[in-house]
């Protein structure tokens, strides 16, 4: 994971106003892993793992792990495979602004998350010669499982 993290950010052009630190928080079912790196020069400066404990909320444990991050640190949440589903469907024939809404209904019977709690994004797939219509990969997760954590991170000025 750390090598992938470093490779990604080594390809990202440096911005004049870039934050001095970037971080990722991996959300696994039984532990959390925080990786913090300096942006210039790119260098991993901290890797910390926290085993999840009964009695404390998931959000509290995440916040305890990122508590020492300076305000405005860019944090990327990485979901483990059990926290999302990926499905492939035909791309709806609607304007781009309406694709997310249309996809919600296209995948509602293909995912375990209730429609009113569905958070999703999609990726266009390259067209194949034997395909009759354009396809998309849809990534779906539970909004309620992430909303409180994201709100708390925003209160702590973590981006």
Where are the regions a protein language model picked out?
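Hydrophobic/aromatic-enriched cytosolic interaction surfaces used to assemble or bind macromolecules
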Residues: 1-159
């Amino acid at each position: 994971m750390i090598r992938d993290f470093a490779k990604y950010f080594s390809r990202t052009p440096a911005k004049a106003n870039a934050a001095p630190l970037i971080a990722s928080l991996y959300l696994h079912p039984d532990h959390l892993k925080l990786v913090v790196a300096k942006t210039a020069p790119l260098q991993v400066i901290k890797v910390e793992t926290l085993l999840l404990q009964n009695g404390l909320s998931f959000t509290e444990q995440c916040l305890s792990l990122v508590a020492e991050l300076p305000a405005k640190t860019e944090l990327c949440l990485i979901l483990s495979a059990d926290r999302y589903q990926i499905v492939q469907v035909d791309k709806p024939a609607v304007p781009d602004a309406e694709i997310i809404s249309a996809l919600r209904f296209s995948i509602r019977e293909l995912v375990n998350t209730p429609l009113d709690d569905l958070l999703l994004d999609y990726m266009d797939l390259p067209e194949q010669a034997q395909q009759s219509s354009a396809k998309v990969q849809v990534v779906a997760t539970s909004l309620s499982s992430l909303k409180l954590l994201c709100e708390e991170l925003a209160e702590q000025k973590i981006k």
